[in-house]
């Protein structure tokens, strides 16, 4: 049992339902119910966007109790009569507990009727933040930065920059080039979350010794309308040579650094403030774009410039934002011929992510003389940019016939599923800038009568940005080349995940992604790097995984060694083009050798070498 004190803050509301003056305003207040106790805020008059900023001590709570739920209801105050409900929502303590472990202190709650209420929360004792490990294995570097995140929202400043030591691998690149390496982007797009560190690496492949004056990487984010920048969200810069020349050097800006042939890896880290918007591209003329930019000033060689767009998600736009609010929509009509037709639509929640099915239960009760033929459901989207009110457009439409038709004094219940597309835009509200909202229009087709319909809102939210979806193992294994030299970084990842069944190599080692090793690079890097850096996440299986990789490597290097020992290095490329590995040498026939080389002397040398190999085995 984990008992903690909980203090709840009712901060503000937005887009609330209008209950007064023809729906243009309300006098809202919030009422909380928990364990038989009630709490109530002050009433804010004539507004749909109230600011309360009131706090309540909820008491000592068992945070592991799945039945611990706070009822949050927003009501419209009236001098006379009953106070109208503007909407309510169930707030499980478990949601607050999970959010607190990630450093969140507030959430927007979606009311079941219309609008949102923002609540803050504080546990006592507080939850420790989940520890973040830096690429050098030191958790303190990142933890110090997390402790300074509160400075961002209060004074607009970013926390102090964090620098990491560069990594050098003595490989043999063929061209001078650079690329950005993002965590976990081999299987799916990397998604960064606002309010958290943004980590990546810049890899510089050097094919000849060079001297660099500067290596700078920057993170920029902005919103734009009609191609014109409207707001700058973030702009930050890192000098990747900072650690190479020493941060305390008085002339660090003017010093040059020599880089040898090989793969130079520069891990870097930025921080995106919690209030920044989610990435948006292609919503009318409105865009929110984030990108990494890199510039290398190289002596006596052309500069290298590189940029890469990244995807950023504000946690408020994801499934973590919304508590589960039920759909319960009821409407009815009375035909002129008498009786009543009632339709009730229910669902356990009103928030869905793109690609998720919207499953609705439709119940029809017919006490009239009319016949009910079918139900039609239409998902509508309205996009309003700046102060231009958008027009609802149809996103998808489904219909379901009632067999048989619903006659007088009959009722029927049907499950209707709306399959949302994977590319569906999420609901957005940014005051005065953009608003994307969704509604479901349900129409009951009644024979010889005006149709009965109702409209109710739903939210489209982004899925969990940290969800990892692995590809099909059989597909991945079938794509791994027999020859390790031809492996891509993705092939190595699939080999570890699915052939060796050891995902811990990746999931338990935050610096694994930085190396982004191809098979050709595996042939040249030292064993110490493999054991102590790349494979250390395997734990007790490190030696086993290392030996398995060495077997794959030896199948290639042993062939090269034999050819070199017999003064036949010119045949190395031919053998590798034909995928001849060490385990196949003893099986090569004289016909095979004649295909590999047309020189009689070379064939005889090869035959003699292979005979010795058979005798030694």
From Swiss-Prot:
The keyword Cell division is assigned to this record: no
Residues bound to Ca(2+) 2: 20, 76, 78, 84
GO biological process annotation, one example: G protein-coupled receptor internalization
GO MF annotation list: cAMP-dependent protein kinase regulator activity; identical protein binding; metal ion binding; phosphatidylcholine binding; phosphatidylserine binding
Keywords: Calcium, Metal-binding
InterPro entries: Arrestin-like_C, Arrestin-like_N, Arrestin_C-like, Arrestin_domain-protein, C2_dom, C2_domain_sf, Ig_E-set, SAM/pointed_sf
One Gene Ontology cellular component: cytosol
Gene3D superfamilies: 2.60.40.640, C2 domain (2.60.40.150), Transcription Factor, Ets-1 (1.10.150.50)
PROSITE patterns: C2
Domain annotation C2: ranges: 1-109
One Pfam family this sequence matches: Arrestin_C
Named cofactor requirement(s): Ca(2+)
Residues the entry annotates as binding Ca(2+) 1: 20, 27, 76, 78
SMART domains: Arrestin_C (SM01017), C2 (SM00239)
UniProt similarity note: Belongs to the arrestin family.
Protein name (record): Arrestin domain-containing protein B
Organism: Dictyostelium discoideum (Social amoeba)
Name of the gene this protein is made from: adcB
């Amino acid at each position: 049992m984990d008992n903690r004190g909980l203090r709840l803050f009712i901060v503000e509301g937005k887009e609330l339902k209008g209950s007064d003056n023809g729906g243009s305003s309300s006098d809202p207040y919030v009422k909380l119910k928990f364990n038989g106790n009630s709490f109530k805020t002050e009433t804010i008059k004539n507004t749909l966007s109230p600011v309360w900023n009131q706090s309540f001590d909820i008491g000592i709570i068992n945070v592991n109790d799945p039945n611990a739920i706070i009822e949050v209801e927003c009501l419209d105050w009236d001098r006379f009569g009953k106070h109208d409900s503007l909407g309510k929502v169930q707030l499980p303590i478990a949601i607050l507990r999970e959010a607190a472990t990630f450093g969140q202190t507030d959430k927007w709650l979606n009311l079941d009727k219309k609008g949102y209420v923002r609540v803050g929360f504080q546990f006592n004792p507080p939850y420790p933040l989940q520890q973040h490990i830096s690429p050098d294995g030191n958790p303190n570097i990142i933890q110090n930065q997390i402790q300074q995140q509160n400075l961002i929202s209060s004074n607009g400043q970013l926390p102090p920059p964090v620098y990491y030591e560069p990594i050098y691998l003595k490989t043999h690149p063929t061209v001078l080039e650079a690329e950005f390496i993002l965590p976990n982007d081999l299987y799916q797009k990397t998604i960064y979350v606002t309010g958290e560190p943004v980590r990546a690496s810049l890899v510089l492949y050097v094919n000849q010794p060079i001297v660099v004056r500067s290596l700078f990487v920057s993170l920029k984010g902005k919103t734009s309308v009609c191609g014109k920048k409207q707001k700058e969200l973030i702009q930050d810069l890192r000098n990747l040579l900072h650690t190479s020349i020493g941060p305390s050097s008085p002339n660090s800006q003017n010093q040059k650094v020599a880089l040898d042939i090989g793969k130079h890896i520069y891990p870097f880290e930025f921080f995106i403030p919690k209030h920044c918007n989610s990435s948006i591209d292609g919503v009318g003329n409105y865009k929110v774009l984030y990108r990494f930019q890199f510039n290398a000033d190289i002596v006596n060689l052309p500069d290298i410039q590189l940029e890469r767009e990244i995807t950023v998600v504000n946690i408020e736009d994801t499934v973590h934002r919304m508590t589960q609010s039920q759909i319960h929509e009821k409407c009815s009509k009375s035909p002129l011929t008498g009786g009543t037709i009632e339709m009730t639509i229910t669902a356990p929640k009103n928030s869905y992510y793109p690609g998720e099915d919207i499953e609705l239960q439709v119940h029809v009760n017919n006490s009239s003389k009319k016949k009910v033929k079918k139900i039609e459901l239409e998902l509508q989207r309205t996009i309003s940019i700046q102060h231009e009110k958008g027009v609802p457009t149809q996103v998808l439409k489904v219909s379901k016939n009632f067999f048989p038709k619903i006659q007088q004094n009959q009722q029927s219940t049907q499950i209707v599923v709306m399959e949302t597309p994977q590319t569906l835009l999420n609901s957005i509200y940014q005051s005065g800038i953009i608003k994307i909202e969704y509604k479901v229009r349900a129409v009951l087709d009644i024979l010889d009568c005006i149709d009965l319909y109702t409209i109710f809102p739903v939210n489209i939210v982004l899925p969990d940005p940290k969800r990892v979806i692995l590809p099909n193992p059989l597909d991945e294994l079938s794509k791994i080349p027999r020859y390790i030299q031809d492996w891509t970084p993705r092939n190595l990842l699939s080999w570890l995940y699915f052939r060796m069944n050891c995902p811990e190599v990746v999931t338990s080692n935050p610096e694994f992604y930085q190396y982004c090793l191809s098979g050709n690079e595996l042939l040249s890097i030292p064993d110490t790097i493999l054991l102590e850096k790349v494979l250390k996440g395997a734990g007790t299986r490190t030696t086993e995984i290392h030996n398995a990789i060495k077997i794959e490597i030896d199948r290639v290097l042993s062939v090269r060694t034999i050819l070199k020992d017999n003064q036949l290095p010119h045949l190395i490329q031919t053998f590798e083009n034909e995928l001849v590995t060490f385990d196949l040498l003893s099986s090569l026939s004289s016909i095979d050798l004649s295909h590999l080389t047309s020189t009689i002397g070379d064939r005889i040398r090869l035959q003699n070498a292979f005979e010795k190999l058979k005798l030694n085995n």
